[in-house]
Amino acid sequence: VLFIIFRKVILGIYAHGFSQEAMRLLNDYAVIIIWSIPFIASYSIFKAYLQIQNAKAISAIAQVVSYVVLIIALLLTFPSDIKLAWAAVMGHMVSFGVLLLFAFGKGFKYCPVLSLRQDYLKTMAIMIFPVFVSSVVSEVNSVADKFFASHYEAGIITSMTYGYKLSFSIQGIVSSSLVIIAYSSFTKKAAQNDLAGLNSQLYKCIQIVSWTVFPLVIGGIVIAGPIIQLVYGHGNFSGNSVNITAAIFSVYLLGVMPMCMKHIGDRICCALQRTDLAMYTALITVGVNIFLDIAMSKRMEYIGLVWATGIAILAGSIAVFIMLKTVDNKLSLRQVVKELIKPFVLSLIMGICVWIIQEM
């Protein structure tokens, strides 16, 4: 409700350099999309509940159902049609509904009365506050990036969005999926105060991620142009747009592995019930990013914004492991680096070979 009342002020900050027509369209879409927030929030809660119940695949099924709704909407409406925004809301509502049905099947019971005297509420509030701050800070970071990008030519924000989503989908597919599976083991080892066992699982997790992500990242950088041409090079997406997006995509890829490392480190912090460390990491990441946005965008324009994002993520990933070392004295940072070197070197050799073949 507050967003709807103050939407012009908020959108003015978010998209300062937009034209009048673009602002009008953004305003129309935002008023509709905002109603998906309750469904997204509820979806996240029930997703966590089902993961605890060892029903991790249900959230993937719910996502597929929401994608089906969006695809049907795309077939029935024009891409610029405002009905597409309502379809997005409908997709989130349907995915939440699917999770809710499975949650009831797993024994979930709804109590309409909230008792503030329950002991776990205080513990939950203490733990969730740093997570809440981290989320707010991350959103501020996103707004800052869009604010600076809105000052450049039309289509830059779109290219940055496409490049970001395509590159960091690697992180979503690889590290997020792995951490979802491993998180219960992390929390079990942390609850038993078995730091040696927790660190052993951490090293294995890093090993799996590095052997998977490094080849994809370096290979993606080498053949960035053909990838963007294949995925986005159709319709109104011109050759110049493909080149711009390919350059953005290549730079964003450099931040994928640091993002994976940061994601894993944040989950270890949560397992150790030190969510404050994740909050400090988020603050460091955003601080570095905004500083570099200001410094690099003046000389390198939009590419400077992309470099700023990658460097900030790297700073955050380094910070989270340094902080983890302060609470887990058995953690070997040397072992963490060791798990990264071999797959990086071999992936780099692979990338050089692919580049030579491509240039022949």
Please give the residue ranges for each predicted region:
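Helix-loop junctions and terminal segments of transmembrane helices
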Residues: 1, 176-194, 202, 265-266
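Alpha-helical transmembrane segments of multi-pass membrane proteins
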Residues: 19-45, 237-265, 280
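Alpha-helical transmembrane segments of multi-pass membrane transporters/permeases
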Residues: 35, 46-75, 254, 261-294, ...
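Hydrophobic alpha-helical transmembrane segments
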Residues: 61-72, 79-105, 284-289, 302-323
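Transmembrane helical elements of multi-pass membrane transporters/channels
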Residues: 91, 95, 99, 118-188, ...
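Interhelical loop/hinge segments that connect adjacent transmembrane helices in multipass membrane
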Residues: 100-138, 196, 326-341
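Transmembrane alpha-helical segments of multi-pass transport proteins
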Residues: 338-360
